[in-house]
């Protein structure tokens, strides 16, 4: 029996006041619908039907490389009508899981519980109890022996509910698991004879009850999982809820967060034990932090690996880089893609490293650019050092071997190699290879001019 997931993503989202389709608005730098697609994959979907309408070009540009079956809903005539567009792609023996592209926080564990709750050849509905159920369809039950809550017999929408039904606080989330054969039959019988003039997907529950099909329910751990976003205020609320959830995961995994409400997690972060994370840190992409790592305030980490006991000092940007054991960067350091700091290496304030390896124990304390370079162990890079790697057309490599001392304000014009133990005098411009243990100074000879008069301002 295959799991066929139908994701409804056809709405425009007028209240977002945006040209972007509603489901493409982001939570943690990922579109809402992408969150839903990712969760569908996690529960083992065999096929995903994406029902789309407004903004097709933008949707396909964002999602088009994925294994999705694109199903057009040319007119938005209700949720039942939307699912019906996917009917030709549903096999009789499929289990159909219906999800929503603007409900991004639904959890894998919740969907697994819903699928487990579905009776054989029956229907499972995800419901939630709300103190204020205004606007939602209510779950209608009838007393049944052996079922404390009673048997589900239907779902009534807010505008069609009686005064008594409006008192019900168990609401329909719209998420359900349905057998394929029966779903297609029920969809063909839907009517739009209701206050909205739409084809309600919820009407299939009354049909299931009338046909004697077993109906069961499951509930999420938190109601926020089934909240949607219809405007930017709600989008921001979901963002905060997502961030709180991800921060909690980090703390449970062994990280200390100085303030869990002031962290942004926009990717997959893996942490070791006793990690310390200060305020206003941003994580993007895939980030791995080893044991006893310290991240300073305001740091941004993107697609990087940080080994045990390493430290990222405040306001540093680490992107596509690796830090070895006990290495450190910052404050105000920038490591660009391809940068690698070996064990105990240090990059200080206002140092930029790009596509360069900094060897064991090597240091560049301040104000340097190290690009397209291989730097050995025990090297000292003075302030103001620049590897001149670009000739206007191509990038060239600088090699600095072990135990080299580079004086301040030195320019290394690549391609160039500095041999082991060499010393480069401050203010030098190095254009040729330097041998082992050589001292090289290329400064202009200092001149002393006596009797010189400093210019003075001309009075107007």
From Swiss-Prot:
Primary localisation category: cytoplasm
InterPro entries: Bifunctional_GlmU, GlmU-like, GlmU_C_LbH, Hexapep, Hexapep_transf_CS, MobA-like_NTP_Trfase, Nucleotide-diphossugar_trans, Trimer_LpxA-like_sf
Entry keyword annotation includes Magnesium: yes
Superkingdom per UniProt: Bacteria
Keywords per UniProt: Acyltransferase, Cell shape, Cell wall biogenesis/degradation, Cytoplasm, Magnesium, Metal-binding, Multifunctional enzyme, Nucleotidyltransferase, Peptidoglycan synthesis, Repeat, Transferase
Region annotation N-acetyltransferase: where it falls in the sequence: 254-460
UniProt region (Linker), positions on chain: 233-253
The enzyme's E.C. designation: 2.7.7.23, 2.3.1.157
Cellular component, GO annotation: cytoplasm; membrane
Region (Pyrophosphorylase): 1-232
Residues that, per the record, bind UDP-N-acetyl-alpha-D-glucosamine: 8-11, 22, 73, 78-79, 100-102, 137, 157, 172, 230, 336, 354, 369, 380
One of the Pfam families matching this protein, by short name: NTP_transf_3
Cofactor(s) this protein cannot do without: Mg(2+)
Cofactor info, note text: Binds 1 Mg(2+) ion per subunit.
Residues holding acetyl-CoA: 383, 389-390, 408, 426, 443
UniProt pathway annotation: Nucleotide-sugar biosynthesis; UDP-N-acetyl-alpha-D-glucosamine biosynthesis; N-acetyl-alpha-D-glucosamine 1-phosphate from alpha-D-glucosamine 6-phosphate (route II): step 2/2; Nucleotide-sugar biosynthesis; UDP-N-acetyl-alpha-D-glucosamine biosynthesis; UDP-N-acetyl-alpha-D-glucosamine from N-acetyl-alpha-D-glucosamine 1-phosphate: step 1/1; Bacterial outer membrane biogenesis; LPS lipid A biosynthesis
Binding site for Mg(2+): 102, 230
GO MF: glucosamine-1-phosphate N-acetyltransferase activity; magnesium ion binding; UDP-N-acetylglucosamine diphosphorylase activity
GO biological process entries: cell morphogenesis; cell wall organization; lipid A biosynthetic process; peptidoglycan biosynthetic process; regulation of cell shape; UDP-N-acetylglucosamine biosynthetic process
Stretch forming the signal peptide: none
Reaction(s) this enzyme catalyzes, per UniProt: alpha-D-glucosamine 1-phosphate + acetyl-CoA = N-acetyl-alpha-D-glucosamine 1-phosphate + CoA + H(+); N-acetyl-alpha-D-glucosamine 1-phosphate + UTP + H(+) = UDP-N-acetyl-alpha-D-glucosamine + diphosphate
Residues at the active site: 366
Family according to the record: In the N-terminal section; belongs to the N-acetylglucosamine-1-phosphate uridyltransferase family. In the C-terminal section; belongs to the transferase hexapeptide repeat family.
Record's subunit section: Homotrimer.
Stated role: Catalyzes the last two sequential reactions in the de novo biosynthetic pathway for UDP-N-acetylglucosamine (UDP-GlcNAc). The C-terminal domain catalyzes the transfer of acetyl group from acetyl coenzyme A to glucosamine-1-phosphate (GlcN-1-P) to produce N-acetylglucosamine-1-phosphate (GlcNAc-1-P), which is converted into UDP-GlcNAc by the transfer of uridine 5-monophosphate (from uridine 5-triphosphate), a reaction catalyzed by the N-terminal domain.
Name of the protein in its database record: Bifunctional protein GlmU
Biological source species: Shewanella baltica (strain OS195)
